Amino acid sequence: MINNLSISSSLIPDKQRGSVESQVFYLTNRVLRLTQHLQLHGRDYSSQRGLWKILSKRKQLLVYLSKRDKLRYDDLIGQLGIRGLKTR
């Protein structure tokens, strides 16, 4: 029922477990699991609220990474298969 990302956590070395990329990876994995849960339980409003919190945290990390290092940001977006940030 719950599938993990096609990108394994072995791509993230042990030294970089707290890096922005690894945090975005784990948050994306949680988003996918919660999305599948909410497809089965559409009225679970506390899970919806948790999903919004996770999405906002992931967005903050992606904004930080895009300002800090655009190449790492583009590589991460490509690996995870998620949409990039909207530019103003």
From Swiss-Prot:
One GO biological process term: translation
Primary location class: plastid
SUPFAM superfamilies per UniProt: S15/NS1 RNA-binding domain
UniProt subcellular location: Plastid, Chloroplast
GO molecular function annotation: structural constituent of ribosome
InterPro entries: Ribosomal_uS15, Ribosomal_uS15_bac-type, uS15_NS1_RNA-bd_sf
Keywords noted in UniProt: Chloroplast, Plastid, Ribonucleoprotein, Ribosomal protein
Top-level division of the source organism's lineage: Eukaryota
GO CC terms of this entry: chloroplast; ribonucleoprotein complex; ribosome
A UniProt-annotated Pfam family: Ribosomal_S15
Family membership: Belongs to the universal ribosomal protein uS15 family.
Subunit structure: Part of the 30S ribosomal subunit.
Protein's name in the database: Small ribosomal subunit protein uS15c
Species for this entry: Pinus thunbergii (Japanese black pine)
